[in-house]
Amino acid sequence: MSDDTVNIEVDGKPVEARPGQMLIEVTDSIGAYVPRFCYHEKLSVAANCRMCLVDIEGAPKPIPACAQPVSEGMKVFTKSPRAIAAQKATMEFLLINHPLDCPICDQGGECELQDLAIGYGRDVSRYNDGKRVVKDKNIGPLVSTDMTRCIHCTRCVRFGEEIQGKPQLGTTLRGENVVISTYVEQNIDHELSANIIDLCPVGALNNKPYRYSARAWEMVQRATVAPHDCVGSNIYAHVLRGTVKRIVPRNNESINETWIADRDRFSYEAIYAEDRLQKPRIKESGQWREIDWEDALESAAAALRGADTLGMLASPSATVEEGWLLKKLANHLGTKNIDHRIERRDFTDQDNDPAYPFLGSSISELENQDAIFVIGSNIRAEAPILAHRIRKAALKGASVSFASREQHEYFFDVDHYLSGADLTDLLTESGVGAVIDKLK
């Protein structure tokens, strides 16, 4: 054994682990699955669901694996009669008040409680008293609530406190009367708030626009990239008979981890908006008239004459393939007037623009920087995933500074704010060194 590892035994199998590593992390690493509800690798340990109880040699009672650090010589049994009995007892308690909503619940087919109840639940309930009922909360247009289904794992609460930095959900009352709700009945409005839908292990928090529109097993999962996210967050599109029904995050530790911005989760609704242009139109005598594709292409071909008089603008959100096709069309027409910088006004230094803008480090390394300076951006609104990484850096002690025309709200400590005029004056009068000194 080295100083960096300890030797333990899991179900008779010798395993090396880091000192202080939580037992549930070790069992996951070797494929010895331990059931859980409150544990999540991106959140702090709560140990309040008790589903991950395991048997440890010498312990007087089963111990929650999510809250037990490993130690030298520990012998763990995840499938012993005592461990299984404890897990089944926990499941029975969880199901006492849980409603039989599976046939209509949007979480059906991908519900962690449903899956584990098959393995650890009883066929017949011994509980004859009335079930607890909780009033649903209206917490905004994006997340629907069925709080009678809530098992109080507090994943959503910890997400607000630890990931968002803006606690929006909390617990009130105690014991079996505990209720999770927003403070003073407010809506949740953080840029990442809808990630609680994915975190919820049951059907208590659901995707409101998607509600009752499809079942999990009916849809096809397509891997893609978020179209409105400048960092390229990885996502899955869930498609039913050619129609996008919902967007969920695709895990990528180097970019978005396991989160996506609400904008990227719900922007697919624009595809099917009533005011979206679905058919080609032509303007005649100041009025728009719908035409078929053949007439539209003929009209476009007739109008596209004279390479020097043509210009093409591509959406910055267009795919690489779409951009390539537009460039191919521009080449065929003999024009070089093609651009994607729709909002840019100053092109005086465009010859020095990088072909591929780059931070100088990977997105994942951003959270390990000692100092971060953001210029001219409301990073929370424009790139929520980057804002999340910057917040992680700030929590580790990084100095974070902003230069912009307006001061925006951030859920971490900001060391310096410079107005655009202040930054310009410093650069003009004293150069970059003065800016660095100002930010120290």
Say what each PLM segment does.
Residues 1-22:
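Generic start-of-chain signal for non-secretory N-termini
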Residues 20, 66, 249-250:
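Residue-level structural signal for beta-strand termini and adjacent loop
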Residues 14, 37-42, 146-147, 181-188, ...:
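Conserved short loop/turn motifs at secondary-structure junctions
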Residues 95, 99, 146, 153, ...:
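Catalytic alpha/large subunits of respiratory electron-transfer oxidoreductases
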Residues 50-226, 231-235, 240-243:
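Fe-S ferredoxin-like electron-transfer domains
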